Amino acid sequence: MARHFLSLHDYTKEELDRLLALAIELKQEQKQGGEHHLLKGKTLAMIFDKSSTRTRISFEVGIYQLGGHGLFISTGTSQMGRGEPLKDTARVLSRYCDGIMIRTFGQEIVDELAAYATVPVINGLTDLFHPCQIMADVMTVMEHKGGYAGLKFAWVGDGNNMANTWIEAAAIFGFDLALACPQGYEPDAKVMAWAAERAPGRVTLTADPKEAVSGAHVINTDVWASMGMEAEQKVREQAFGGFCLDDALAGLAHPDHIVLHCLPAHRGEEISDSVIEGSNSRVWDEAENRLHAQKAIMATLMGGE
């Protein structure tokens, strides 16, 4: 039976640590000019319900560097856009391809695809979770902090898919996470409850960004209005007043803190230009590490590494 990568909570800490170690190894090999055709001749179907820059490019380049081929599929120009049942698509793609990555809206779409696919399914993003991005983020922290143990992580902004997945990561890896979200924009209640049961006291939630950021070693933020929420932009701008990660807020963190943002960034809204361009920013390393983290996931699921 194929193993999927749908959310972090499907994996143990040890399994995720092995994926991170492989990602770091693959990155080092690439930097030294080495090749690792671990998926030679294999094809990854890449289904996109949402527009994409980093997800598409990092998966397409990644499968190529592993010796395979990425096949881009837009739901709008395929039979999925005309109502073909997802379970039929899953079965057919499983006959043609060796793995499926999907970037979509509802988590239930990814779950249904995985239920009927006989090849690995990778969650490239849903409205609930963004596991590939968090693996890249944790990898970035390991590179710049030597690990994640004993660090305080802070999240400032919307309780979106990134926040939900950081909550999972904190509970699984065992680090402290302080989230600051405006009232009414908190993370998913079920995810919070799961983390509270899995790792009591590791995850805290406040409406005060200063409280969350104080003493933090890692600060993370994201856009206030995710894709599909554009109509809420003006309302959210009002609700998120005081939640911009600017120099004053970042100054409350540990002096040697690092700043992460999954991109795209709306400078002057959730993060200031000076912070994202500042000496504590590791945003570009983070973006690069999407490539390496996803290569490790693909190599493990599709190649049995």
Swiss-Prot record:
Signal peptide: none annotated. Carbamoyl phosphate binds at S52, T53, R54, T55, Q79, R103, H130, P131, C132, Q133, C262, L263, R290. L-ornithine binds at N161, D222, S226, M227. It is an enzyme of class 2 (transferase). It catalyses: carbamoyl phosphate + L-ornithine = L-citrulline + phosphate + H(+). Keywords: Amino-acid biosynthesis, Arginine biosynthesis, Cytoplasm, Transferase. Its EC number is 2.1.3.3. Gene3D superfamilies: Aspartate/ornithine carbamoyltransferase. One of its GO terms (biological process) is citrulline biosynthetic process. GO terms for molecular function: amino acid binding; ornithine carbamoyltransferase activity. InterPro entries: Asp/Orn_carbamoyltranf_P-bd (IPR006132), Asp/Orn_carbamoylTrfase (IPR006130), Asp/Orn_carbamoylTrfase_sf (IPR036901), Asp_carbamoyltransf_Asp/Orn-bd (IPR006131), Orn/put_carbamltrans (IPR002292), OTCase_ArgI (IPR024904). Belongs to the aspartate/ornithine carbamoyltransferase superfamily. OTCase family. This is Ornithine carbamoyltransferase. It comes from Pelobacter propionicus (strain DSM 2379 / NBRC 103807 / OttBd1).
